[in-house]
């Protein structure tokens, strides 16, 4: 068997064994995707025992490409809501992430001085304890530049391997302990997150209002500012027995009934000006009007504003709601359409059919993945991650790397949605498949590389001590920040888990946190909110420690 075929076979074996281990449950808690790392360690140990030669270049490529796939799909998933989340809670989350990095650095410094651990070893243990491979690379580079002996620099990888497993398990353990200590109900936390940060808060309400203000009599709809705002849509007007879709030029009369859509606060403002809320049905049943939901798939309308389509004037059809990535938005005239947007329409059946043709409504397109934007995004991400950032006094340039670059680009592209005929929408099933494939490949290779000397160092060397140091570097910051965030900041548990995973730049921990609730995106959103800054600080921190302690 060729080296390439053998390498692929070993990776498949690692994935099967690791996923099986990940399904084991102890008191309802399992390693999940993190089990792949231990599958890799087991297979790696026996591969070295039986002197199996694997293709090193291929393993390196698979490890990096798997990580790129994982972080890119995470960015595409959370991109639409990332920047709004950053404005709402990003400062608080990133402050906790900074605190975690600082506490981890202090614990590392104390262990280094208290137990006289060689600087290269403690930096390797530190990188493994915080599960950050780019930090290991940065530490190796700066120590080499500072003149550290090559044999000590090479031992950093073993320190990393010793600390990495507990770095993976430790964060899962802390999440579990916080859940037990605070007696947290995950379903309740998910509902609370939805109500305060997204779905339920953004769910639109309706109100039927009777026109009682005589000052409005004789005015057209476009002459009433509140009825033309970006916060409220008037989708139906009832006059006597006639139900119609109001156009911008429709004249308002006293006694008219208006069906309004918007958030409660905005609806109340309109009610105060227009008249009073009434319990009158403005249903389309038994009328010439009907309602329908259509999806935007036509590339020709992507990026266009609802005003520019002029659907009301052309087809006598009103867009009452716009659902984007599970969040309902007011279909204001200034709203731009993105691929996958779901529109609620009101109008005559033939008019709705015409509007459906305009926006696309091709359901099968939602199951297709445009591969060109995927590789454009990955390529741009790799380029961004490769840009060096030179800081005076640091001999090694800082980089976002292959993990940070694709994530940042994916967040931006996910927020933009589309450029011309290119759209970055990805069906949830395809996104999940690529994400899981990426993290399995990454952890399989990390486990294989660590497994060879793992047992020998653990049993005959200083492996146990290194594991202990790593456990402290992992556990103390996580417990400190986790308890503070829950007790003082009253942080949502799922948001907290995502923040902890992002602060540790730990994809397996995010996979575990995502698995705590099947539908909530809270963990992924907070992970992406803190990840870019945390990655930068994780890359900088071992370099700062190396510079500080090299001369001491």
Swiss-Prot record:
HAMAP family per the UniProt record, alphabetical: YidE
Domain RCK C-terminal, first and last residues per copy: 192-276, 279-361
Classification via InterPro entries: AAE_transporter, RCK_C, RCK_C_sf, Transpt_YidE_put, YidE_YbjL
Gene Ontology molecular function: any one: monoatomic cation transmembrane transporter activity
Membrane-protein topology: Multi-pass membrane protein
Segments passing through the bilayer: 1-21, 26-46, 65-85, 96-116, 119-139, 158-178, 371-391, 393-413, 439-459, 464-484, 493-513, 530-550
Protein name: Putative transport protein YE4162
UniProt record, GO biological process: potassium ion transport
An example Gene Ontology CC term for this record: plasma membrane
Coiled coil (residue ranges): none
Subcellular location, record wording: Cell membrane
Taxonomic path: Bacteria, Pseudomonadati, Pseudomonadota, Gammaproteobacteria, Enterobacterales
Presence of keyword Transcription: no
Domain of life: Bacteria
Keywords: Cell membrane, Membrane, Repeat, Transmembrane, Transmembrane helix, Transport
Sequence similarity: Belongs to the AAE transporter (TC 2.A.81) family. YidE subfamily.
């Amino acid at each position: 068997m060729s080296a390439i075929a053998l390498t692929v076979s070993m990776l498949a074996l690692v994935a099967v064994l690791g996923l099986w281990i990940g399904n084991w449950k102890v008191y309802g808690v399992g390693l999940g995707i993190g089990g792949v790392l231990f599958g890799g360690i087991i297979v790696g140990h026996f591969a070295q025992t039986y002197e199996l030669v694997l293709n090193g270049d291929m393993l390196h490529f698979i490890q990096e490409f798997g990580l790129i796939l994982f972080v890119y799909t995470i960015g595409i998933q959370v991109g639409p809501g990332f920047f709004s989340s950053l404005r709402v809670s990003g400062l608080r989350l990133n402050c906790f992430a900074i605190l975690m990095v600082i506490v981890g650095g202090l614990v590392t410094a104390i262990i280094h001085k208290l137990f006289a651990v060689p600087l290269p070893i403690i930096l390797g243990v530190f990188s493994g304890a915080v599960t950050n491979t780019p930090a290991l690379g940065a530490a190796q580079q700066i120590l080499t530049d500072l003149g550290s002996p090559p044999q000590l620099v090479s031992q950093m990888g073993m320190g990393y391997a010793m600390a990495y497993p507990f770095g993976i398990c430790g964060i899962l353990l802390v999440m579990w302990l916080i859940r037990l200590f605070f007696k947290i109900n995950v379903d309740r936390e998910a509902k609370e997150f939805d109500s305060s940060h997204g779905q339920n808060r953004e769910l639109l309400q309706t109100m039927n209002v009777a026109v009682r203000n005589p000052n409005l009599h004789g005015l057209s709809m476009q002459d009433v500012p509140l009825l033309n705002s970006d916060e409220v849509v008037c989708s139906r007007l009832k006059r006597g027995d006639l139900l119609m879709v109001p156009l911008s030029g429709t004249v308002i009369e006293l006694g008219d009934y208006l069906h309004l859509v918007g958030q409660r606060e905005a609806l109340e403002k309109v009610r105060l000006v227009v008249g009073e809320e009434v319990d009158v049905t403005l249903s389309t049943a038994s009328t010439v009007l009907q309602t329908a939901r259509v999806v935007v798939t036509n590339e020709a309308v992507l990026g266009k504003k609802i005003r520019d389509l002029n659907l009301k004037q052309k087809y006598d059809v009103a867009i009452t709601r716009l659902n984007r990535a599970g969040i309902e938005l007011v279909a204001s005239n200034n709203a731009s359409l993105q691929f996958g947007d779901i529109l609620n329409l009101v109008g005559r059946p033939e008019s709705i059919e015409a509007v459906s043709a305009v926006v696309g409504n091709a359901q099968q397109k939602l199951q297709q993945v445009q591969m060109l934007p995927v590789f454009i995004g990955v390529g741009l991400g790799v380029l961004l991650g490769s840009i060096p950032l030179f800081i005076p006094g640091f001999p090694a340039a800082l980089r976002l790397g292959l993990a940070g670059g694709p994530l940042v680009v994916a967040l931006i592209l996910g927020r933009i949605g589309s450029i011309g005929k290119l759209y970055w929408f990805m069906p949830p099933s395809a996104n999940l498949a690529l994400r899981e494939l990426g993290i399995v490949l990454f952890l399989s290779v990390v486990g294989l590389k660590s497994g060879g000397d793992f047992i020998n160092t653990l049993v005959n060397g200083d492996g146990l001590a290194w594991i202990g140091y790593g456990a402290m570097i992992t556990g103390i910051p996580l417990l400190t920040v986790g308890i503070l965030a829950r007790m003082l900041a009253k942080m949502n548990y799922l948001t907290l888990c995502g923040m902890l995973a992002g602060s540790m730049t730990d994809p397996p921990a995010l996979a575990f946190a995502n698995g705590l609730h099947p539908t909530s995106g809270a963990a992924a959103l907070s992970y992406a909110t803190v990840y870019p800054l945390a990655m930068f600080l994780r890359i900088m921190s071992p370099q700062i420690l190396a510079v500080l302690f090299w001369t001491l």
